[in-house]
């Protein structure tokens, strides 16, 4: 008897799992003549086709899979000409959608899906408001400015009331998550801040507003709801990217990493959202060309991947990322580079550490590198003009194989700084500095600590100027 109960329990689990891992969505379009419809969904910045259905009877289509589960989000069915209509998957996967060929969106209804019935009702009410605004615009020429604005405001108030009622009555509906996520953050009124002379400090007040915005940016976004990943890009994707690309653009490295952790922590109730955020932020700063952003990548790998929290990566790929992070960590700003010893054009060995200057510019380059042919002369002009101004010395390390061409390039361009042959060195600097392209430029202080790297020649003058003035900190 006990064995029978166990078998029955196992069978029940299998049936439940099977019912959860399938979908059946019937589409019925009156007077429709299409032979095929496409089922698609939104994901981040794109749209994706995930299924097709062919009509066995005019206007009747069935999307069905017994081995696939549809995640929560906004989906759509479309014909081959691009006409489409949206619906939601909100913990329901077996229902029927009916509509009319005349206007798919305005006639759409649902059977067997309470979530879609609510969604369609809300959207259709909004269509009514949109139509009325359109009618007002047509009549605008025959109305006074006051009458037109009053009519539009009344419609807007009714639309806002409709939204608030929906949110109140359906707080857990997918559409509610979307509507809340698209609400702008309202910055409260900032108390006046005064300077020592009694005048209003508008800069300090603006900073207060900015700090509030940074700290409350995601207040309306439920980062524990992964359904937001499968919505039109304007709902989540664009808003999320704006945070890193614009709001946090000029923040120091420590602040960016701090807020990255805060945002990620908000997603810990959702495996999918957590995975997306950790992966995106890590990749974002791996690929960034902004100096110092590689340090964020290193910290992300250490905190989430090496610790085992990000457990979705293949072991071989994980090992490569950790190896790269360990290598890049040694190249972080403030780290001391090992001494480089190479022979010059006369085979006299020189040491990086022997350069006695306030700043040292270490350049890895090649005479046959197209980018080097433009960057090296720019850098040399800076060197000539500012060598004594900032007490700067240069070690230019050659990576080209033809030493004759290397020497000819030096003479032709008049590069009167320390030129050394990197093919003969005391260690594998190419691997140590993880050089993938040239020129690769590193700026060091007198103690051989990295203060800048992967910096272009045209940005060096301002960097050294501001660093020397104490306006740039490590």
Language model: regions and residue ranges:
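Non-catalytic, surface beta->alpha helical segment in thiol-disulfide oxidoreductase systems
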Residues: 78, 437-440, 446-474
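N-terminal "domain-start" segment that seeds a small globular fold
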Residues: 313-352, 462-472
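Structural microenvironment flanking redox-active thiols in thiol-disulfide oxidoreductases
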Residues: 374-411, 425-431
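Bacterial Sec-dependent N-terminal signal peptides
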Residues: 1-28, 474
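Short active-site neighborhood of thiol/selenol oxidoreductases, capturing the structured segment around
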Residues: 350-379, 393-395
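Short, internal strand/loop/helix patches
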Residues: 410-442, 446
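A non-transmembrane, solvent-exposed segment enriched in polar/low-complexity residues
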Residues: 22-171, 178-182, 186-227
């Amino acid at each position: 008897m006990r064995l029978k109960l166990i078998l029955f329990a196992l069978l029940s689990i299998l049936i439940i799992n099977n019912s959860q891992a399938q979908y059946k969505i019937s589409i019925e379009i009156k007077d429709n003549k299409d032979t095929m419809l496409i089922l698609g969904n939104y994901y981040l910045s794109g749209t994706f086709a995930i299924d097709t259905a062919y009509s066995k009877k005019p206007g009747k289509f069935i999307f069905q899979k017994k081995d696939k589960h549809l995640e929560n989000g906004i989906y759509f069915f479309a014909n081959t000409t691009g006409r489409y209509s949206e619906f939601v998957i909100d913990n329901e996967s077996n229902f029927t959608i009916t509509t009319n060929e005349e206007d798919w969106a305005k006639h759409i209804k649902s059977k067997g899906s309470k979530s879609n019935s609510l969604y369609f009702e809300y959207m259709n009410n909004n269509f009514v408001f949109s139509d009325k605004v359109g009618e007002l615009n047509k009549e605008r020429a025959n109305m006074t400015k006051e009458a037109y604005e009053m009519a539009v405001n009344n419609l807007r108030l009714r639309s806002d009331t409709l939204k608030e009622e929906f949110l109140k009555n359906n707080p857990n509906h997918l559409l509610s998550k979307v509507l809340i996520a698209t609400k702008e953050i309202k910055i409260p009124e900032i108390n006046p801040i005064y300077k020592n002379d009694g005048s209003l400090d508008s800069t300090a007040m603006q900073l207060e507003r900015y700090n509030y915005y940074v700290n409350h940016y995601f207040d309306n976004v439920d980062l524990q709801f992964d359904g937001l990943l499968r919505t039109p890009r304007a709902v989540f994707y664009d808003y999320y990217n704006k945070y890193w690309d614009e709001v946090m653009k000029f923040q120091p490295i420590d602040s960016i990493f701090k807020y990255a952790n805060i945002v990620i922590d908000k997603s810990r109730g959702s495996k999918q959202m957590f995975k997306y955020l950790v992966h995106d932020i890590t990749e974002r700063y791996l690929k960034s060309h902004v100096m110092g952003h590689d340090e964020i990548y290193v910290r992300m790998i250490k905190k989430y991947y090496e610790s085992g929290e990000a457990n979705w990566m293949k072991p071989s790929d994980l090992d490569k990322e950790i190896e790269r992070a360990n290598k890049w960590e040694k190249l972080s700003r403030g780290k001391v580079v090992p001494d480089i010893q190479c022979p010059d054009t006369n085979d006299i060995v020189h040491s990086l550490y022997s350069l006695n200057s306030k700043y040292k510019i270490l350049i890895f380059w090649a005479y046959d590198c197209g980018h080097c042919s433009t960057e090296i002369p720019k850098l040399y002009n800076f060197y000539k003009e500012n060598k004594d101004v900032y007490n700067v010395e240069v070690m230019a390390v050659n990576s080209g194989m033809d030493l004759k061409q290397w020497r000819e390039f030096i003479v032709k361009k008049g590069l009167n700084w320390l030129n050394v042959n990197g093919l003969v060195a005391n260690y594998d600097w190419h691997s140590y500095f993880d050089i993938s392209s040239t020129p690769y430029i590193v700026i060091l202080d007198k103690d051989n600590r990295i203060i800048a790297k992967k910096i272009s020649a045209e940005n060096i003058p301002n960097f050294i100027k501001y660093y020397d003035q104490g306006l740039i900190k490590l």
